[in-house]
Regions:
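Generic recognition of well-ordered alpha-helical segments
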Residues: 2-5, 120, 158-161, 165
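Extended redox/cofactor-interaction regions of prokaryotic respiratory oxidoreductases
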Residues: 2-114, 122-130, 142, 195-294
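Short, surface-exposed amphipathic charged segments that create phosphate/polyanion-binding patches used
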Residues: 35-36, 117-118, 133-137, 186-188
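Phosphate/diphosphate-binding loops
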Residues: 90, 96-100, 104-109, 144-164, ...
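Short, solvent-exposed loop/turn motifs
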Residues: 118, 221, 310-311
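Catalytic alpha/beta core of large soluble enzyme barrels
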Residues: 119-120, 345
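Glycine/threonine-rich phosphate-binding loop and adjacent beta-strand/alpha-helix elements that clamp
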Residues: 125-148, 163, 349
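Long, contiguous, secondary-structure-rich segments that constitute the structural scaffold
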Residues: 149-200, 267, 272-285, 289-373
């Protein structure tokens, strides 16, 4: 928040490229009401589960606070057994005998290993979709290049068929994927342009907030946010200490971050053998002094652990790691890692105050030589 305030503080928003950009995805005028149809809820508020705490929540019993125990789960576009924090608890939850799990997938992921049913999903080559971006302002159209292979179906078709079997007869459950692509932007994007060219640029100015007009109640860049203060959060962008701060624990003196490995995209592509061969094995980048204190040599198998769990990887002594900080590279699928583990054994289900997201990089650990190399 403090960094985001700097361009307004010095008046840089008036200049082309003078502002700040986290992601361009918020600039897309998606008609979410047309796609999500909140009007059909008729005043009801369905229970929502934060996917970052799925490990705890799958293990929770029924209670007035939590509601009924989770008895069924449909997983799509995700591999939570590999990517969700504190994966030891995630595995315990998915392994419950009384949990009915359906996974929509292309591959036999760690999560698919715990499915009662695996339904084959179409790939991007086989279905309609529209795409936003993190870093540019073109809407992109995805048209199927081939018919669905075998029994594969788009997620949306599975949802339509499930809705029909559950007795939902609203017209929206009969919308085709192409119709939803057309409805996604309404009259904000020329769909004929999309069909012709495959992409359509948004009509956005080079200096969007040169004259103000921020999406805030005041229309200004608000250094103090009354909306956040009303939620019990700090209205000013003050420093918030880490959940697990370096130096706060004698037992776990190292801070661990878990950035993507060079040849994977988080947990995607880990199943591609040629990419695994290039990546080698799960690596932990560690500073030479931290390694020497623990008798760790370059290339030896180490155990990284805290109170939440442990995982195994190979030590990579590197100047990229500063003293006191280690880098657990990549979200390896558990079954493709060392000893059936990955870095998310150690990450926490604690949530941030703003946004209720996971604190993946607030993670204190210890590193030791593994007993068996």
């Amino acid at each position: 928040r403090a960094v985001a305030c700097l361009p307004a503080l010095i008046g840089a928003w008036r200049h082309r490229a003078g502002g700040v950009l986290l992601s361009s995805s918020g600039m897309y005028p998606v008609n979410r009401a047309a796609l999500q149809r909140p009007d059909l809820l008729a005043g009801k508020t369905p229970r929502t589960i934060n996917m970052s705490t799925i490990g705890n929540d799958l293990l929770r019993a029924a209670s007035p606070e939590f509601g009924p125990q989770i008895e069924a789960l449909v997983v799509y576009n995700s591999n939570p057994v590999a990517v969700a924090p504190e994966s030891g608890k995630v595995v315990q939850g998915f392994a419950r005998d009384n949990l009915f799990t359906v996974v929509l997938e292309h591959f036999k992921t760690d999560t698919a290993d715990y499915a009662d049913y695996i339904l084959p999903a179409t790939t991007q080559l086989e279905h309609w979709d529209v795409h936003l971006s993190y870093g540019h302002t073109d809407v992109m159209l995805n048209q199927p290049a081939i018919a669905p292979v075998g029994q594969a179906k788009p997620n949306t078709q599975i949802f339509r068929e499930l809705a029909k079997r559950m007795g939902f007869d609203e017209a929206c459950f009969k919308d085709s994927d192409e119709t939803m692509c057309r409805d996604a932007f309404g009259d904000k994007v020329d769909f004929a342009h999309l069909l012709r060219d495959g992409f359509a640029p948004l009509n956005v100015p080079d200096a969007p907030f040169a004259q103000g007009g921020f999406p805030t109640p005041s229309g200004k860049c608000e250094f103090f946010s009354a909306r956040l203060a009303a939620q019990g959060l700090d209205g000013l962008p003050d420093h918030v200490p880490n959940y697990e701060s370096l130096g706060s624990s004698a037992i776990y003196p190292l801070a661990m971050i878990s950035p993507p490995a060079r040849n994977f995209l988080n947990s995607s592509f880990v199943n591609v053998k040629s990419l695994r061969d290039m990546e080698g094995e799960p690596l932990l980048e560690i500073h030479a002094d931290d390694a020497a204190q623990r008798g760790i040599a370059h290339g030896t198998v180490v155990k990284v652990f805290n109170d939440r769990g442990s995982y195994h990887c190979k030590a990579h002594i590197s100047p990229r790691a500063r003293q006191g900080v280690v880098h657990g590279l990549g979200i390896w699928w558990r079954k493709l890692g060392l000893h059936g583990t990955n870095v998310n054994e150690l990450t926490s289900q604690h949530l941030t105050d703003m946004g209720r997201g996971p604190v993946f990089y607030d993670c204190l650990v210890q590193v030791a030589l593994n007993e068996v190399q």
